[in-house]
């Protein structure tokens, strides 16, 4: 598979460009790019700059997703998971981090704070119908597959 070329702009306060921790990883680590450490109190959230802007090609989008290690160790997640970046957005990528833990968490410049996943976007054409075809699941929703 050929790599997708994504334009990236390093802003003045950028710490590092997104990187994959391991070959073949789907998510690229995003780094905090603020000048002073930020403390996130339990139950609170804050916006963390990454110091980068993207030029996603037409037909692509990106998700900003939590890092599992931050969630497991500190209760830190991305508030609007997943954060959606459309191909036309050219501003700085910022991450809304929320502290679901019980103690304040300090985020410092250079910390890996989230993951960026770039995906193709299919063009959708809705076809209005009077009824939908049957399915095995039908209208089962929350908890329909068991608890």
UniProtKB/Swiss-Prot annotation:
It comes from the Bacteria. InterPro entries: dUTPase, dUTPase-like, dUTPase-like_sf, dUTPase_trimeric. Its cofactor is Mg(2+). Substrate binds at residues 67-69, 80, 84-86. Keywords: Hydrolase, Magnesium, Metal-binding, Nucleotide metabolism. It holds the Pfam family dUTPase. The keyword Magnesium applies. Transmembrane segments: none annotated. It is an enzyme of class 3 (hydrolase). Coiled coil: none annotated. Pathway: Pyrimidine metabolism; dUMP biosynthesis; dUMP from dCTP (dUTP route): step 2/2. SUPFAM superfamilies: dUTPase-like. One of its GO terms (biological process) is dUTP catabolic process. This enzyme is involved in nucleotide metabolism: it produces dUMP, the immediate precursor of thymidine nucleotides and it decreases the intracellular concentration of dUTP so that uracil cannot be incorporated into DNA. NCBIfam families: dut (TIGR00576), PRK00601.1 (NF001862). PANTHER family: DEOXYURIDINE 5'-TRIPHOSPHATE NUCLEOTIDOHYDROLASE. Belongs to the dUTPase family. This is Deoxyuridine 5'-triphosphate nucleotidohydrolase. It comes from Gloeobacter violaceus (strain ATCC 29082 / PCC 7421). The lineage of its organism: Bacteria, Bacillati, Cyanobacteriota, Cyanophyceae, Gloeobacterales.
């Amino acid at each position: 598979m050929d790599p997708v070329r994504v334009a990236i702009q390093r802003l003045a306060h950028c710490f590092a460009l997104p990187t994959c921790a391991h070959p073949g990883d789907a998510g690229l680590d995003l780094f905090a790019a603020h000048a002073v450490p930020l403390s996130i109190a339990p139950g609170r959230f804050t916006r963390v700059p990454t110091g980068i802007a993207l030029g996603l090609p037409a037909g692509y989008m990106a998700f900003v997703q939590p890092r599992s290690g931050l969630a497991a160790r500190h209760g830190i997640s991305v508030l609007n998971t997943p954060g959606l970046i459309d191909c036309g957005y050219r501003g700085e990528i910022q991450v809304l981090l929320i502290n679901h833990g019980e103690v304040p968490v300090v985020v410092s410049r250079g910390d890996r704070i989230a993951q960026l996943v770039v995906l193709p976007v299919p063009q959708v054409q809705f076809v209005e119908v009077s009824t939908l075809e049957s399915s095995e699941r039908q209208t089962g929703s929350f908890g329909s597959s068991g608890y």
